[in-house]
């Protein structure tokens, strides 16, 4: 009986689906289980014994292509309403794992793992879910496309948890709902993650394939490892992802969030010797978020209250020629913000200072990203003091081939009888994994105090990302008078070029 049991256990362990990254087994048939597990950092429930196992990581930095020094194993399965990940990260150098109860997103200087889910399987944009050894969360998006976000994200991802600042844009401003818990164990750490499907936008196909990249940061050595072997001699990091195959019968449920807010204030002052004089004031506001479909989300807001939003980090203005640049942190604007991204930051939502009301639709239909935003700004910036500007923004981007895109953008800011309008197109073409070319042509039309003008903005970039050598050549021409009132173009009347080798 004992021998039979041992043989059964050994046979069961051997037949677990194992996918070796270094063995190029990058197509993962993810198991669908009618099960749940407690998110406690302990991978001891029966569901984990039936999960797919991602093993044999490769080093990405400092030397890509080598076998990872520290072993990492990622378990993955999904239930009807969520996808689950279990992480076993081994450490062979003793008690050197760095893990603290850091603030959300601030785990870049600690041992951590990032899971990138490309739910549209287009190798262009992925949801980012990161955790340190204690389960402290990091989340956002990662894109190979552009170097600047609509909410003020820089090409290096703002320096908060960016795995490699040379590979696309990491935006950690969005926050998603997911569960995680981790713990230190002998020889490393373990983390358990549950991501509900209602936190994601994904395709409408009955059977789906999702792109997946898993990255591990080993803090004491500075090494960065990936499950799918990734080389830096490639113009697309997400293009080197693996694939989760066969996801079906996903239950997202009703995605409807209502956030009513009431704010009251009572002021008192000793106006007379007999007593105080009191005055009161109050405001009502509300937000709604509706997941119309798996791939489309509608947001609305009326008189939004941003008093609980994290304050901006102070900046010192030394050169008055350029405006200060702040990231977007307001919840209404953050949801789906990555779909508004353009080259050269033609959309910058911080231009809408104090919205009185707004509506936004964002998502992906077939091979086209769609993002629209309409809002009234309560912050009057006119000379007369009686105008509330209206903002309208539309961004479309169509997938071409494996990684290339063709996009268009329309923006307008209407302020009384004045206006600032813009239309543009951009093209990004990849070739032979090493090269990409990015072209953009934009025209602005402005009418202010009865004076009309029309001015162009043109830019071009040619890039090669290679192991031995690479380059990035670019030129930009912005005519004097070009005006993008809904974007962040901090200097006009210039022609400049850059050469990096």
Name what the model sees in each region.
Residues 11-399, 405-407, 417:
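Structural preference for beta-rich elements and adjacent junctions enriched in aromatics
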Residues 284-291, 357-363, 388-400, 421-437, ...:
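Feature captures outer-membrane beta-barrel proteins of Gram-negative bacteria and organelles
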Residues 262, 374-376, 410-412, 425, ...:
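Active-site proximal loops enriched in glycine and acidic residues that flank catalytic Cys/His/Asp
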Residues 1-8:
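Bacterial N-terminal signal peptides
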Residues 351-355, 381-388, 413-422, 444-454, ...:
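Solvent-exposed loop/turn segments connecting transmembrane beta-strands
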Residues 306-351, 439-440, 447-500:
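Extracellular/periplasmic loop regions
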């Amino acid at each position: 009986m004992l021998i039979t049991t041992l043989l059964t256990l050994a046979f069961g362990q051997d037949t677990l689906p194992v996918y070796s990254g270094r063995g190029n087994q990058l197509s993962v048939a993810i198991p669908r289980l009618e099960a749940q597990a407690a998110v406690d950092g302990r991978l001891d429930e029966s569901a984990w014994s039936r999960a797919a196992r991602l093993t044999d990581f490769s080093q990405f930095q400092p030397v890509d292509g080598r076998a990872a020094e520290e072993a990492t194993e990622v378990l993955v399965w999904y239930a009807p309403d969520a996808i689950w990940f279990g992480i076993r990260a081994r450490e062979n150098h003793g008690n050197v794992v760095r893990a603290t109860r850091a603030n959300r997103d601030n785990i870049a200087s600690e041992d951590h793992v990032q899971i990138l889910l490309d739910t549209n399987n287009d190798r262009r944009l992925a949801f980012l879910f990161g955790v340190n050894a204690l389960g402290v969360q990091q989340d956002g998006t990662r894109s190979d496309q552009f170097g600047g976000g609509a909410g003020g994200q820089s090409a290096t991802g703002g320096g908060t948890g960016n795995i490699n600042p040379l590979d696309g844009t990491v935006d950690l401003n969005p926050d998603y709902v997911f569960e995680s818990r981790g713990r230190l164990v002998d020889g490393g750490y373990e983390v358990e993650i549950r991501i509900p499907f209602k936190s994601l936008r994904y395709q409408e196909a009955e059977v789906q394939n999702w792109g997946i990249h898993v990255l591990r940061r080993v803090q004491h050595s500075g090494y960065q490892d990936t499950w799918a072997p990734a080389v830096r001699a490639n113009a697309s990091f997400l293009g080197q992802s693996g694939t989760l195959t066969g996801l079906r019968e996903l239950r997202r449920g009703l995605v409807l969030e209502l956030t009513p807010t009431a704010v009251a204030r009572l002021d008192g002052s000793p106006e007379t010797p007999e007593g105080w004089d009191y005055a009161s004031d109050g405001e009502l506001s509300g937000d709604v978020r509706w997941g119309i479909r798996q791939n489309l989300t509608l947001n609305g807001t009326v008189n939004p209250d941003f008093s609980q939003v994290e304050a901006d980090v102070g900046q010192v203005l030394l050169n008055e020629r350029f405006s200060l640049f702040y990231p977007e942190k307001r919840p209404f604007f953050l949801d789906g913000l990555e779909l508004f991204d353009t080259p050269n930051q033609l959309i910058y939502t911080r231009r809408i200072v104090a919205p009185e009301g707004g509506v936004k639709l964002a998502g992906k239909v077939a091979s086209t990203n769609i993002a629209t935003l309409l809002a009234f700004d309560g912050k009057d910036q006119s000379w007369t003091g009686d105008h509330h500007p209206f903002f309208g923004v539309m961004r479309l981007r169509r997938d071409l081939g494996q990684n290339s895109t063709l996009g268009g953008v329309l923006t307008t800011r209407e302020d009384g009888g004045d206006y600032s309008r813009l239309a543009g197109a951009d093209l990004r073409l990849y070739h032979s994994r090493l090269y990409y070319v990015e072209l953009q042509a934009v025209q602005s039309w402005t009418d202010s105090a009865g004076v009309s003008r029309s001015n162009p903005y043109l830019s071009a970039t040619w890039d090669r990302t290679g192991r031995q050598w690479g380059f990035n050549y670019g030129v930009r021409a912005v005519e004097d008078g070009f005006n993008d009132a809904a974007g962040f173009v901090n200097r006009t009347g210039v022609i400049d070029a850059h050469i990096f080798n």
